[in-house]
Amino acid sequence: MKNRFNGKVVWVTGASSGIGEALVCNFMKRGSTVIASSNEPAELDRVLKNCVGLPGKMICAPFDLSDTSGIEQIADEQVATTGGIDYLINLGGISQRAAIVDTPLWLDRKIMEINYFGTIALTKAVLPHMIRQKSGHILATSSISGRFGFPLRSAYSASKQAIHGFFETLHLENKKNNIRASVIIPGRVRTKISLRALDAQGREHGKMDAGQEAGITPEKAADQIIRGIIRNNREILVGSGELIMLYIRRYLPWLFFRIADRIRST
């Protein structure tokens, strides 16, 4: 089977751990040049050392999604360095574990700033370059909680639902430019997302949710994402049995609300 990623340039945010790290290694095995971004430079260096010997190339480009002021310059620099971006995979983000009544507005804004505005800022910075090269594929990460509300995740769910609206519009506006847009919808994946989720004081939750612990590995999630890219899927579902909640919410909403009322971990 032809390797469509050999020699391609792939930009991955959230690349210092979890699904992002697994994607970096997967694409490098396929011969891609991977721009790896995160707000943790030391962890990016660790990923780079772990990928030594793979046929692809990794470029470390650390930045913080919560500070959008310099993103356009970073994008211009990476395009100049690599000659162009073929795939942009927005994985960086933050989750939440706090009830609405306990969550201050500044925390809602912070989560939205990282998950939504940070993602679209990088997307808008890369898009003109893709339009000029008349090709590209931009992906953003939502969540199954981006398809429905869920307890203790109000701002997180809202930020992920906003991603769907933006990227559906991105796809419709740029199909004529030969640019695709897709949304990745993860369920339970064994990453640090619940450990790093923010509580009502903006501190790390520090606990691994039982559902997260039982989830698929980041490596399997990366395989599912790449398979979805190859198939040109508009929505790429990542996970296993928990994804049935998407269908229950759509076709049996009464059952969904009964189940969601009892579940506190995803």
PLM-predicted stretches and their roles:
Residues 16-17:
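Conserved glycine-rich cofactor-binding loop
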Residues 123, 159:
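Active-site helix of classical SDR
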Residues 99-100, 107-109:
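Substrate-binding pocket helix/loop in short-chain dehydrogenase/reductase
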Residues 176-240:
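SDR active-site lid
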Residues 143:
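Residue(s) in the substrate-gating loop at a strand-loop-helix junction
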Residues 30-47:
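Conserved glycine-rich Rossmann-like NAD(P)H-binding loop of the short-chain dehydrogenase/reductase
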Residues 91-96:
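Conserved NAD(P)H cofactor-binding loop of Rossmann-fold oxidoreductase domains
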